[in-house]
């Protein structure tokens, strides 16, 4: 009999039941102190303040060479908080921010958190209609935007009467002469005047702030899921869920020390960007190297020039990782990534290149979702298995369930991954129906259904096996009906020597069954010989009913804003 009490307890059971959620074999990799540590009970701002109280002269942010200490950052946050309160922002209000991770964005997020307001972080690439919709959905009284988006913001003020527009410049915090060059380039054309953020703060002479008291499960951050099949959903996180990510990184034994440097190229409007790139980075007392131009070659150049101790990147930056591995790499302490994940061949290629350049590290993969803020399981330098997603964090539990019966499955069996974790979202914004479908409350525990397939081995390592939503029904030549897994086909394609990227979509035929169509980006050109080898490999490694009849060569793979393959934009036959 599975004991719900055992499932809720943060300890490894003495007996082996055969079920990961009960046995928790991953806990053997954590210290007793980590397992028993109490979760922080404070706001996001209070947490970074507390964790850096005695090291305020350390550098918090490095922005194009301009270094901002923790003391300076806290002062900037408090001044911005006073300005927001003077402008009428109160506890519980929502302010919409459309910006990159410049210092001003970071101080806005924590200033709003300090006074109990919520930051609604929206994509920089939204259309005018989408901007209006996301501002009005949360009833924002203030809209803060980066001036790089001026062309899209221009003209929407008339449709948002009563909303104050505040513009931020990516140049204001840059060192001279970069600041002078940048300011000279800017021209603003708003119909109604927008307020410059620097003036917004400077005109507020008061530094007195009415700090909001901590409330359990209080709203803090709204980010948006990077869906590939529909409109992104607003994901609401609390102070507790955001702090839980940072705290578990602290107690897990990741080897990230105060004063070390941490490269952050991921914008704050992604869950990973605000949670890991900003909040965890600051909570751990590291120096965040802010890289706001998400171009692969520039990220690679920054890694080589700045030599950050810790580099954590999304799947879109795989080429940057490979390009940045040059010379003696013994300075690197962490190279990690997640998101859409990488193939076994790509992972081994990265590891081999690291080792060739004198590093003892392996590339670390992990697993997370916007709904978790970021990470729920990860490999670590001290604890890893190649091709796995690592182990759950010390305060996190996992169970694998049968997608149809919802019964828990034992070790080694593939099913839907469900997590119980303190960094779980509160809900989907204004979407109780979808929230109820995603978060299951069972025997007093909340389990978030990921929609992803995986399994757990007897050591507690988690493996990704595909996506539940990408399972289709097809029919073999003999008429037998089978399940079709596009992810499996993609893995075979990605293992082909000539294939740089691969994607598979499924199209319905005239009798309502499904056929796979493969899209590939080749490393060099496109020849019939290459395609023949690819088709031969598919035939050798896949059952007949899974082999795509069509393999299309395309020049580049369409990506979502978070760097994942955008299946909706693949050309149709």
Where are the language model's segments positioned?
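Conserved AMP-binding/adenylate-forming core of the ANL superfamily
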Residues: 39-40, 57-102, 106-110, 127-132, ...
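Conserved structural elements of the adenylate-forming
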Residues: 74-79, 202, 235-257, 265, ...
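AMP-binding/adenylate-forming catalytic core of the ANL superfamily
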Residues: 126, 133, 145-148, 421, ...
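Gly/Ser/Thr-rich phosphate-binding loop
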Residues: 165, 309-312, 322-385, 397
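Conserved pre-ATP/AMP-binding loop-to-beta segment of ANL
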Residues: 188-224, 231, 255-261
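Conserved AMP-binding/adenylation subdomain of ANL enzymes
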Residues: 243-261, 269-312, 324
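Conserved ATP/PPi-binding loop(s) of AMP-dependent carboxylate-activating enzymes
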Residues: 391-395, 407-438, 467, 479-484
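AMP-binding/adenylate-forming catalytic domain of the ANL superfamily
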Residues: 540-565
């Amino acid at each position: 009999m599975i004991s719900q009490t055992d499932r809720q307890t943060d300890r490894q059971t003495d007996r082996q039941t055969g079920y990961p959620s009960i046995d928790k074999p991953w806990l053997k990799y954590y210290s007793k102190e980590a397992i028993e540590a109490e979760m922080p009970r404070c706001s996001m701002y209070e947490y970074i303040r507390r964790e850096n109280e005695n090291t305020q002269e350390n550098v918090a942010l490095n922005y194009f060479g301009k270094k901002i200490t923790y003391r300076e950052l806290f002062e900037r946050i408090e001044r911005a908080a006073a300005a927001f309160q003077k402008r009428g922002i109160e506890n519980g209000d929502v302010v919409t921010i459309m910006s990159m991770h410049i210092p001003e964005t970071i101080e806005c997020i924590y200033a709003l958190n300090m006074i109990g307001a919520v930051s609604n972080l929206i994509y920089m690439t939204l259309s005018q209609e989408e901007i209006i919709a996301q501002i009005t959905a949360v009833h924002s009284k203030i809209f803060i935007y980066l001036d790089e988006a001026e062309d899209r913001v221009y003209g929407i003020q008339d449709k948002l009467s009563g909303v104050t527009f505040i513009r931020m410049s990516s140049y204001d915090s840059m060192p001279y002469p970069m600041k002078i060059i940048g300011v000279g380039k800017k021209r603003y054309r708003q119909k109604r005047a927008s307020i410059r953020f620097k003036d917004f703060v400077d005109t507020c002479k008061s530094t007195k702030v009415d700090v909001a008291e901590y409330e359990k499960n209080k709203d803090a951050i709204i980010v948006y899921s990077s869906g590939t099949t529909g409109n992104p959903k607003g994901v609401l996180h609390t102070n507790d869920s955001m702090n839980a990510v940072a705290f578990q990184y602290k107690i897990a034994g990741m080897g990230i020390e105060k004063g070390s440097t941490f490269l952050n190229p991921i914008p704050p409007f992604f869950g990973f960007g605000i949670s890991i790139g900003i909040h965890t980075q600051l909570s751990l007392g590291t120096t965040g190297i802010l890289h706001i131009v998400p171009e692969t070659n520039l990220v690679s150049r920054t890694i080589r020039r700045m030599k950050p101790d810790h580099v954590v990147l999304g799947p879109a930056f795989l080429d940057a990782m490979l390009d940045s591995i040059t010379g003696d790499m013994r300075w690197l302490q962490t190279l990690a990534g997640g998101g859409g994940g990488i193939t076994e061949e790509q992972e081994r290629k990265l590891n081999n290149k690291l080792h060739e350049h004198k590093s003892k590290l392996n590339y670390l993969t992990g697993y997370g979702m916007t709904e978790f803020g970021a990470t729920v399981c990860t490999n670590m330098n001290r604890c890893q298995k190649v091709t796995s997603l690592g182990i759950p964090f010390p305060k996190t539990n996992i169970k694998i369930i049968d997608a149809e019966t919802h019964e828990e499955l034992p070790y080694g069996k593939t099913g839907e991954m469900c997590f119980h974790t303190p960094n779980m979202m509160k809900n989907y914004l204004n979407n109780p129906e979808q929230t109820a479908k995603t978060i299951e409350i069972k025997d007093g525990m909340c389990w978030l259904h990921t929609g992803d397939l995986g399994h757990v081995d007897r050591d507690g390592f988690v493996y990704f096996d595909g996506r539940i939503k990408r399972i289709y029904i097809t029919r073999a030549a003999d008429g037998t009906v089978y399940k079709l897994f596009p992810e499996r086909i993609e893995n075979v394609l990605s293992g082909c020597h000539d294939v740089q990227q691969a994607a598979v979509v499924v199209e319905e035929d005239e009798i309502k069954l499904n056929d796979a169509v493969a899209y590939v980006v080749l490393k060099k050109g496109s020849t019939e010989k290459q395609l023949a080898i690819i088709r031969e490999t598919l035939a050798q490694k896949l059952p007949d009913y899974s082999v795509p009849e069509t393999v299309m060569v395309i020049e580049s793979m369409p990506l979502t804003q978070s760097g994942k393959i955008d299946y909706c934009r693949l050309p149709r036959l």
